[in-house]
Every structure is written in C-alpha cells, then in structure tokens.
C-alpha cells in the first residue's frame, strides 16, 4: 500500500554524477530539524570539520518517528518529539537509492548520548548554530565537487533541506 504524502510535505530528488541509472537497494533514514529561536541543532564532526542535520538509518520494524527519537537521543543527547515530516529527499548514487525523511521536531528533554565507534572517531558532538550560518556552510557544497563527493552530496542535501523547509 502506497503511503499518502502529508499535506505541506515537500519532496526533492538529487542524482549524483555517478548514478548508474537504476538502483538495487534503498537505505531509509530519518533526520530532525530542531529549531529554537534562530538556531538549529546540528551534528558536528570535530575531526573531519563536517556539519550535518542529526539523524540516521531506520532500523527494521522501526517507525520513522521512532527512528528520529532514537537517532537524536544517540547523537545529540536530546529527547525530541517529531511533529511532522516536512521533506522527503530521494538521492541516487551508484546503484543505490537513499530515502531521507526530515521531521520538524521539538526538544522534550535530555537523554544519554550513545555514539557509534565511527561517530566517536570523528569527534561527533551536538552544536547549536544560527540558521543563517548553517545555510551558508551548506551552500558551499559545490566547492567539494572535485575533491570530496561525499561531502558535496551531504552539503547539497542539507542545503536543499534547509532552504525548502525554512522560509527565511
């Protein structure tokens, strides 16, 4: 059964230059856009100098909202309430599809951070950043086109998410 698109939810498609024209697997993930005043909650990797909207892979049997709650607690130490899915992004790279759901969310409390080994190695930590600064950082996605396709794709995705969802 096909899910109905929520009213007010936007959808965009990003196709990488290495996309092979069809995909044989889909990775689903959920991310949270958490805004307080004029600041947004981001995850920052101190060792790689990389910013991202917090979230991660949806586990088997897990609802999208449960994924948002779990991932934000693990990565940021915040308990959040996902309000609504504001954006769906379909990304295509190689022979894979990445389906990302962005939920507008609010903070409800604190949790214990539980980072993966890779996140620990990269020095991941939560940071609050003015929205305009986050948009500025992510807007520079094209400067990584020749040197870092992973970061280019990540920053293009996050820039697209913020500019589609936040109407400032």
Please name every model-derived segment:
Residues 24-26, 94-99, 118-123:
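A generic structural micro-feature
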Residues 34, 42, 104-105, 128:
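Conserved hydrophobic "DFG−1" position in protein kinase catalytic cores
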Residues 49, 120-168:
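Nudix hydrolase/Nudix homology domain
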Residues 35-74:
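Conserved Nudix-box catalytic region and its N-terminal flanking loop in Nudix hydrolases
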Residues 27-31, 98-102, 159:
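Short hydrophobic/aromatic beta-strand or adjacent loop that forms the aromatic wall/cage
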Residues 1-31:
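Acidic, metal-coordinating catalytic segment for phosphate/diphosphate chemistry
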Residues 91-114, 127:
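Active-site-adjacent beta-strand/loop module that shapes the phosphate/pyrophosphate-binding cleft
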Residues 79-87:
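A short coil-to-beta-strand element that immediately follows conserved catalytic motifs
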